[in-house]
Amino acid sequence: MSLEITPQLREELRSHFPALATGTVYLENAGGSQVPVQVADRIRDYLLESYVQLGAGYGLSKRSTELVHQAHSLVRLLMGGKENEGEVILGSSASSLLQMLSDCYSRVLQAGQEVIVAETGHEANVGPWTRLDRHGVETRWWRMNPEDFSCSLDQLEDLLSDRTALVAFPHVSNLLGEIVDIRQITTLVHEAGARVVADGVAFAPHRAMRVSEWGVDWYVYSTYKVYGPHMAALWGRSDALGELTGPNHYFIRDVPYQFELGGPSHEGCAGLLGLSDYLEKVVGVEEGSLGRSDIDRAFEIMAACEQPVQSRLLEYLCSREDVRIVGPEVDGPARVGTISFVHADKSSQAITEVVDRTEIGIRHGHMYAYRLCEALDLAPEDGVVRVSLVHYNTPDEIERLIEVLDQALA
């Protein structure tokens, strides 16, 4: 169902983000989004009024303990995980959570078993798995086709065997910007008796997550790229969690705390709850009433805000013969607003240096998809120019960027 996104709605949503009034145009959102005032207020209030340790018997400690529990429950709701199917593990970053997960697997996998790793991945979901080779676990590469930037299911099927322990891949490449068919991949992997580790960091800002519906075993995203504090969340299916022992103190057996070494940021958990306040504003429901259908609706609205903006940028880049888009050139439901390109003659660094002077935030480089840049024959340090949009970006901001790119690309 198409939604009409009016200028008034855009301004209403933007009004919740104080940083958007500073004069900087934020088009580097794949590196980290801005936060709404509701998130910042929750963090401030917690630090000033509730900054105590958890697990004690007095009232304020009990309330803080419940707040951290509520944050886990909210993130599970955001990720679309059914309550009896899995748990949410909170941590400082997707990189740290995936390294923790790999370390846990290193204690149960056997020499000669294999992990399949997608070449299109962010290093956070690549390096931890390739390093299992020190334990005799072999890496099989799910290679990208440089013609269409895809990792084919036929190739995956050929790679899978009775030695496959798990398959690690991005739901959306943070450089290419295309949504893959996660359910189809998961079905294929499960038929081979292996586990799925999906990196949803570049997907989560743009669409609603549905981990139970997809059937994934592990799914990670960064909360600071979805309008929240600098944290990350890893959802684990119950049977997958049951195969592992977490790294926390030996006497901590409760899940998820067994996997949260040192515990999550308490003020960060408060900030996560502030995101529910913002999403309630997006869909216009009463405070404290956010449900799963509201989350779905909020992300439908946000995707509808993004679509004309990313479509205009793709149209502009496609119109230039001196530019090659690294990723799908055609807009559509499987395309998010993370758009990368290279120039026929100019370095990516030279282009971004021109744009930087105009207080428009974009980025160049490998975006931590270092191996993907190598596979594309791009010098990783120069890499691509990446423009990454989210729902609070406007058509006027893109026109401003295009005006600057006309100069930078000339």
PLM segments and residue spans:
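Pyridoxal 5′-phosphate
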Residues: M1-A410
